[in-house]
């Protein structure tokens, strides 16, 4: 069965409050903290406002692209439970993990089987491996069947243009589903009705 879900790219207090107060809240809520090209990016002032909201049963995740020391220093005292990191070597991940004492979600971008195999380099330096599509937020998909060869003990999170109607396809998979764009009414604007439908669908599977 599905292990849980993450809603990523939340950028306003009203939506965040709705999400954490939902009867079936996501296990993870993600915030884009240094990818300024993203329509979901939140600056430090807004980030502090958002993270002052009680997370209740959810875990807060800071999404970081590359080993951005400046950003890591700015957010080090914020109540993130996890850092989700793209484009860092295992050695860089170890340093970040030790310095900031955060749990780590390593994000790998997937196009083929060789990309998937890279998880072996990170399995000992992260709590969760996120298998995402190429292209940073471009709502691209990849063949999720490529993950069938990933060892069972790996905590797997998957992203890549997952829509609400796709959720049932994963009912026999032990994945954490990571969604963002499919829950929006327009780029960067989350839709409460879509969020509600998604969370209820995941819960009822």
Each predicted region: which residue ranges?
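Conserved N-terminal beta1-alpha1 strand-loop-helix module at the mouth
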Residues: 1-205
């Amino acid at each position: 069965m599905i292990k849980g879900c993450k809603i990523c790219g939340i950028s306003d207090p009203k939506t965040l409050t709705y999400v954490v107060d939902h009867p079936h809240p996501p296990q993870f809520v993600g915030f884009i903290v240094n990818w300024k090209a993203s329509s979901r990016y939140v600056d430090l002032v807004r980030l502090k406002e958002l993270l002052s909201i009680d997370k209740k049963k959810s875990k807060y995740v800071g999404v970081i692209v590359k080993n951005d020391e400046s950003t890591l220093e700015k957010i080090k005292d914020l109540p993130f439970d996890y850092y989700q990191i793209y484009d860092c070597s295992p050695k860089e991940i170890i340093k970040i993990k030790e310095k900031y004492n955060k749990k780590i979600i390593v994000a790998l971008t997937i196009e083929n089987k060789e990309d998937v195999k890279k998880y072996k380099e990170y399995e000992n330096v992260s709590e969760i491996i996120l298998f995402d599509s190429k292209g940073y937020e471009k709502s691209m998909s990849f063949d999720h069947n490529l993950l069938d060869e990933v060892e069972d003990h790996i905590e797997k999170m998957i992203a890549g243009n997952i829509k609400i109607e796709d959720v049932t396809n994963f009912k026999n998979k032990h994945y954490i589903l990571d969604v963002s764009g499919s829950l929006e009414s327009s780029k960067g604007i989350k839709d409460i009705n879509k969020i509600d439908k998604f969370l209820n669908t995941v819960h009822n599977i």
